[in-house]
Amino acid sequence: MKFLLAVAFFILISLCIEEAYSKEKSSKKGKGKKKQYLCPSQQSAEDLARVPANSTSNILNRLLVSYDPRIRPNFKGIPVDVVVNIFINSFGSIQETTMDYRVNIFLRQKWNDPRLKLPSDFRGSDALTVDPTMYKCLWKPDLFFANEKSANFHDVTQENILLFIFRDGDVLVSMRLSITLSCPLDLTLFPMDTQRCKMQLESFGYTTDDLRFIWQSGDPVQLEKIALPQFDIKKEDIEYGNCTKYYKGTGYYTCVEVIFTLRRQVGFYMMGVYAPTLLIVVLSWLSFWINPDASAARVPLGIFSVLSLASECTTLAAELPKVSYVKALDVWLIACLLFGFASLVEYAVVQVMLNNPKRVEAEKARIAKAEQAVGKGGNVAKKNTVNGASTPVHISTLQVGETRCKKVCTSKSDLRSNDFSIVGSLPRDFELSNYDCYGKPIEVNNGLGKSQAKNNKKPPPAKPVIPTAAKRIDLYARALFPFCFLFFNVIYWSIYL
């Protein structure tokens, strides 16, 4: 028995603690919430009686106490005409990948509601500026943006809604919105394109029998000076139209639209795409002036050009939507890539001409013949001795004790002495030398030694001769490639500009 009492007491204490905690939590939530405004039609008679009779609040209560926001003005009568105008605060750049743009606007709607005519005893101004909390108490058009992707209201620091009620029953509502709107792009002329982006305002539930949207006369869309990073937008290029739509089963729904014409600025793409790719193509032509034998210089130059252009194509493709048609920029990049690839193909043709088997065999035979001719010339030079000399030289010998110098010495002192007495005593195997007996070089202006030195000098090896056909290909390429690229530029810019 005592055990059951203890359990019951424990359960009772737990319930009390839980109830106290829930009350504390709800009170904290209530403090954080803003007090909700009740429309006059929802307030009790006692609450309405507390309002002073001559106050503006009392006049509003008298207007709205029997007001039903669920019923449109002129119910079962003529449709309500809603005059619309827009003030554009900011205009975001168009995103090519998602095909949309973002705007920040003041949307203003004005209509007449006979139920909201101010009483004759109202002595204030012709319009009442009403707190946005009363906006929910009024009937309002069910406007939405037909091509909207996302949108949001602004409530910093207060809810950005402005409400006016005029003496004759006109109601003006202005609200600040940020909207992302779809804009289907035609990128055929990209980046020299002009885009037309729409903003469509449509009724969601009311047909044309109940509601009609009308653009305000004058300038329904007010646009201040707005600078976009890639586009130019001007007030003169804004168009207005009617886009009333028919939906099967429900009928016609009112719709108005504004069309913004945006012209793309080409400067960014000129500096970032066209100029670099043009220079890369011109760089690939430098290989035509490099010796065909210099493969280490020509091949990397061509490969660098092709890879750079291919990388540029890949980078731009990632930044643009995947469309099924060819854009103007694609035509340019493909043409530049073909010119770079053609320079590589041209060098391949030159290499085929250089490595032709018949040409290689003929070159080997020519080099061998040249080497044989050089060998014969060296033997003739070695036979040029004193007795075979055509020009007389002054020679002398040096004798130390009983040993004679092992070579004939020619010196400047001998040339001055004009001594020919020892010529007959020289053995036949002695040869002239350009060195004296002490191994020092001497200069002989008209003697046999200088002639023999020239003849004994080994000639350089024969250089391979580049075929005329290979040279002709490079020569033609130097003129043909720039001419073709210039012709392509004339056609390209005349079409797309």
From Swiss-Prot:
Domain of life: Eukaryota
Glycan attachment residues as annotated in the record: 54, 242
PANTHER family: NEUROTRANSMITTER GATED ION CHANNEL
Free-text activity regulation comment from the record: Channel opening is triggered by extracellular glycine. Heteropentameric channels composed of GLRB and GLRA1 are activated by lower glycine levels than homopentameric GLRA1.
GO MF term list: extracellularly glycine-gated chloride channel activity; extracellularly glycine-gated ion channel activity; glycine binding; transmembrane signaling receptor activity; transmitter-gated monoatomic ion channel activity involved in regulation of postsynaptic membrane potential
Cytoplasmic side: 290-294, 350-472
Residues the UniProt record annotates as site (Important for obstruction of the ion pore in the closed conformation): 307
Role played: Subunit of heteromeric glycine-gated chloride channels. Plays an important role in the down-regulation of neuronal excitability. Contributes to the generation of inhibitory postsynaptic currents.
Entry-annotated residues carrying Phosphothreonine: 391
Chief location of this protein within or outside the cell: membrane
Binding site for glycine 2: 250
PROSITE patterns listed in its UniProt record: NEUROTR_ION_CHANNEL
Disulfide bridge positions per record: 183-197, 243-255
Homology family: Belongs to the ligand-gated ion channel (TC 1.A.9) family. Glycine receptor (TC 1.A.9.3) subfamily. GLRB sub-subfamily.
The name this protein goes by in its record: Glycine receptor subunit beta
Extracellular side: 23-268, 316-327, 497
NADP found in the keyword field: no
Highest classification ranks of the organism: Eukaryota, Metazoa, Chordata, Craniata, Vertebrata
Catalytic activity line of the entry: chloride(in) = chloride(out)
Gene Ontology cellular component annotations, sorted alphabetically: cytoplasm; dendrite; GABA-ergic synapse; glycine-gated chloride channel complex; glycinergic synapse; plasma membrane; postsynaptic membrane
UniProt: glycine 1 binding residues: 108, 174
Sorted UniProt keywords: Cell membrane, Cell projection, Chloride, Chloride channel, Cytoplasm, Disulfide bond, Glycoprotein, Ion channel, Ion transport, Ligand-gated ion channel, Membrane, Phosphoprotein, Postsynaptic cell membrane, Receptor, Signal, Synapse, Transmembrane, Transmembrane helix, Transport
Cell location: Postsynaptic cell membrane; Synapse; Cell projection, Dendrite; Cell membrane
Signal peptide: 1-22
One of the GO BP terms on file: adult walking behavior
UniProt-listed InterPro entries: Glycine_rcpt_B, GlyR_beta__ECD, GlyR_beta_TM, Neur_chan_lig-bd, Neur_chan_lig-bd_sf, Neur_channel, Neuro-gated_channel_TM_sf, Neuro_actylchol_rec
Stored CDD domains: LGIC_ECD_GlyR_beta, LGIC_TM_GlyR_beta
